[in-house]
Amino acid sequence: RLLHHIYGRSGIKTRHSVVDDFKSSGSFELFFNGQGATPGTKSRNDTYISKGRQLFVDVANKLMTDSDFDTSDITHLITVSCTGFYAPGPDYDIINSLGLGSSIERYHLGFMGCYAAIPALKLARQLCMADKDATVMVVSVELCTLHFQARPVMDDMISASVFSDGGAGAIVSSKKPANGPYYSLDGFESAITEKGKEDMAWSIGDQGFNMTLSTYVPDILSSELHSFLDPIFEKYNITQDDISLWGIHPGGRAILDKVESTLSLKNDALRASRSVLS
């Protein structure tokens, strides 16, 4: 009953999973294939390899299809993931499948958690600022449902209700695309707080990866939000009223609600984040 309550209040309508066990018409391949509901880390990571490598390639292909760039334009490749490991890694798969140059520079940001896409974009921007000919492909894939824990632990139930499977990417370049809209990456800022290190963590266990995600995380973020944002507004000479649309990491409905109330945002200011969450 508690699990149904948590899922019902999550604000999420659809969850995607590469694991057939979770599909109504699927077969039991991972969680109930003779290992019970607690398969070992190796079995979970083997599924990450078989399912994840294709998703990395699919995202990369879509980036090229939807952009004005050719494969010959890509000078750097950044891959991002914290839900599995293998080598040669996803960078190798993308290069081979798309026919990218063998001399392309490759970087992987691993096990940094769900915020790692932001450092990846920052790294891409720095590479472009250092090289006027740089065009960087960034691909992030996470398969969180592989690490579902079938036990009545609150942290496990909360994390399972929020995180699922998917991939995303971007092409960051020193050159403006010939057609279509684009975003400009004007700057990045980050800060560390000691308050939450016991409330949000990610570690490797014998039966998959273990997520610590306490219910205090939204309150911790709320307490630090103004002290983090105020210097940024001053640095870029803007005010909160200048921002019409916010992209807040949708790490749960409670986080979005807390950010909205703390900053006194209008009801539709987080519509993009709520759309991603749902």
Task: Give the location of each predicted region.
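Generic structural marker for isolated residues within well-ordered, non-membrane alpha-helices
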Residues: 3, 60, 91, 229, ...
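Claisen-condensing/thiolase-fold acyl-transfer catalytic domains that form or cleave C-C bonds
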Residues: 47, 82-84, 89, 96, ...
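Phosphate/pyrophosphate-binding loops at sites that engage ATP/ADP/AMP, CoA/4′-phosphopantetheine
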Residues: 59-74, 227-244
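Short polybasic/polar patches that bind polyanions
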Residues: 8, 18, 40, 65, ...
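Conserved beta-strand elements of the Class I
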Residues: 75-78, 135-137, 244-247
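Condensing-enzyme catalytic core mediating Claisen C-C bond formation in acyl metabolism
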Residues: 1-49, 135, 144, 148-223, ...
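Short coil/turn segments at secondary-structure boundaries
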Residues: 39-54, 78-85
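Acyl-thioester C-C bond-transforming condensing/cleaving domain
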Residues: 54-73, 82-205, 268
